[in-house]
């Protein structure tokens, strides 16, 4: 078994004094060698971290002892290498951002469905199955017959619902995401919009892959994860995908053989959408990363989750600017 334990965790809970646990939590993680990022907000905790079995056990035990943080939802997988470079505990307004005020999974949420019962539910022809993840995640794997909302960020999901779903027409809606947290808010949102029967996969895709045998699985492809593994297969092991360091899209070995692929600079997904100035910047970043790797250091530009977040923020800013002009 691989030595590094990767633990995705979250819990929606009222944490009025969440700021007070930031420093002791960060200190514990640094002391035990746990890397990754945890988000704290008044609505709860969310994040993915990695470390030794003992270190992850110690972290979870510490969290369980904090008021309201017992029974945190968590999923474990394994990797041969540490998938994160840094250790962070961030204070946020939301632990998962939908951008809609007043959506509170602690007050209303969809019906949880255990992984062992999921196949039966989504095989019902009257159930509309919706993948709440982003399009680049869906491209490498999803459930059979799932609808792709074609969103770039979770903030776009409410608009998808408004334009495409109807409580009078869609009587039963089932949703899923990577670890379950996005569905906490998406199902709460649908309930607020008047949808009656709303279901979501408890523990998300990762829990489904952990508990459902591959020969019985309705999952097709691999599951995108927000760390340096890029994706995991049905055994929750690192999958076959790499990632373009320029646009962060998952890429195959075939795509890496393309003339459009230059490590850290471009790939078939982004070659036509980046400027010469951007490519020069990517080239310099790649050069610095290679130098840092030779020195045995972690370059600041190599944290996958941070770059993905930056890319999302940049796209959101551009979209808002375009809307203002319109």
UniProtKB/Swiss-Prot annotation:
Residues 304-326 are annotated as: Disordered. It is an enzyme of class 1 (oxidoreductase). The active site is at residue 177. One of its GO terms (biological process) is tRNA modification. Residues 123-217 form the Rhodanese domain. Keywords: Oxidoreductase, tRNA processing. It catalyses: uridine(34) in tRNA + AH2 + O2 = 5-hydroxyuridine(34) in tRNA + A + H2O. One of its GO terms (molecular function) is oxidoreductase activity, acting on paired donors, with incorporation or reduction of molecular oxygen. The keyword Oxidoreductase applies. It comes from the Bacteria. InterPro entries: Rhodanese-like_dom, Rhodanese-like_dom_sf, TrhO, TRHO_N. SMART domains: RHOD (SM00450). Its EC number is 1.14.-.-. CDD domains: RHOD_YceA. Catalyzes oxygen-dependent 5-hydroxyuridine (ho5U) modification at position 34 in tRNAs. Belongs to the TrhO family. This is tRNA uridine(34) hydroxylase. It comes from Shewanella sediminis (strain HAW-EB3).
